[in-house]
């Protein structure tokens, strides 16, 4: 039975970043002794809200109320000391330190200026026992499994007497046994009267654990379900879908040529089952899936960033042996990676160097001297044609916006003889104007006969740009939709794991 007074309330929370409104007027309540799930598409605002709750971000508008008091945290340490803990996918622990040291990091017990190891291990042992674990608190963390690391994170929260514990996609790296153990612990925490926030795309987990579900859409509050007997998979999907696809993406029907790219039972690290698909010359195929679907992993394998473990890639009906990126480039297949800053650009080099670095080898003079004339002309051509906003070709690319960095990467591949382009989250972190310019480049490439395979977690973008949508779910293909027939409800239903009897 729901209590009359909420323990945690969000009141009109808004968050704006430069050029991006991440959250708008978020208001809802959470109660002690309940698991409250947060759901929504990628980018709906769930993680941003958790970062506000935990002191990572300050809200632009609104307030967080805990146990009747308006709270504001300067950082995550202040939030943790006030009883608010977030358990992220990427666990924030120190592998070289012991379990006990990680649990009490920042508040190690001292005696005469020296860490009191006996007391430290005793107190940590109590927290470990509380969670039903059988681990020596003096064990270095690096020797434990990911599931055990997660238990240490929870023990760390309990050591601060956390009354609010939020889990952000906590099962993404866990085995089935570890998931069962996590659920056991969460249910115990609920019995103790704590507020549990739970973020997951996995429907079966949501239904197995939740007492209430709040749905977000485009940074806005949609609805809170409190009667779990009256909510099902379709009702949640319907709440998460609420926007028609307009003509803002500029898609138009086009004709295609012969098959240009084919994957025949391809497997790569992170791809659970063999993937087979084909893309024709001039066709744009979108890969859609939720967190952990395997889209990026598939593209990295195709490009030689990781090793394909089974199957074959064909370009123009010819088998391609891809063991490293240079093999893919030589075959005419290019990749714009998801993390453009870490894997796409060379930050401390100029725009000119970033555009020319791949094709440079073909234009050296005498086999060893850089052809400065060609490089200047090529860089200037792509800066103009792609409307890259930069003071000049010699500007360090790290000083450009994300959209202009992405256009420079596209310019790099336009300097090559391209047959296939793989685009992984091509517009992530890019403003609206630059997005439209990227879409126009994609359409232009298709018009030139390039086969385009692009992955995006932005469902409206996939539906708005792609001629055909391939939906991935947990490392396998869940279905395929044509542009003219696809809608958000269909795609999201395919992308989400169905409720099964596996989780009780």
From Swiss-Prot:
Pfam families: ABC_tran. The keyword Chaperone does not apply. It is an enzyme of class 7 (translocase). Keywords: ATP-binding, Cell inner membrane, Cell membrane, Membrane, Nucleotide-binding, Repeat, Sugar transport, Translocase, Transport. InterPro entries: AAA+_ATPase (IPR003593), ABC_carbohydrate_import_ATPase (IPR050107), ABC_transporter-like_ATP-bd (IPR003439), ABC_transporter-like_CS (IPR017871), P-loop_NTPase (IPR027417). It catalyses: L-arabinose(out) + ATP + H2O = L-arabinose(in) + ADP + phosphate + H(+). ATP binds at residues 40-47. The keyword Cell inner membrane applies. SMART domains: AAA. Its main location: membrane. Residues 8-243, 256-499 form the ABC transporter domain. Its EC number is 7.5.2.12. GO terms for molecular function: ABC-type L-arabinose transporter activity; ATP binding; ATP hydrolysis activity. It is found in: Cell inner membrane. GO terms for cellular component: plasma membrane. SUPFAM superfamilies: P-loop containing nucleoside triphosphate hydrolases. It is a peripheral membrane protein. The complex is composed of two ATP-binding proteins (AraG), two transmembrane proteins (AraH) and a solute-binding protein (AraF). Part of the ABC transporter complex AraFGH involved in arabinose import. Responsible for energy coupling to the transport system. NCBIfam families: PRK11288.1. Belongs to the ABC transporter superfamily. Arabinose importer (TC 3.A.1.2.2) family. This is Arabinose import ATP-binding protein AraG. It comes from Escherichia coli (strain UTI89 / UPEC). The gene is araG.
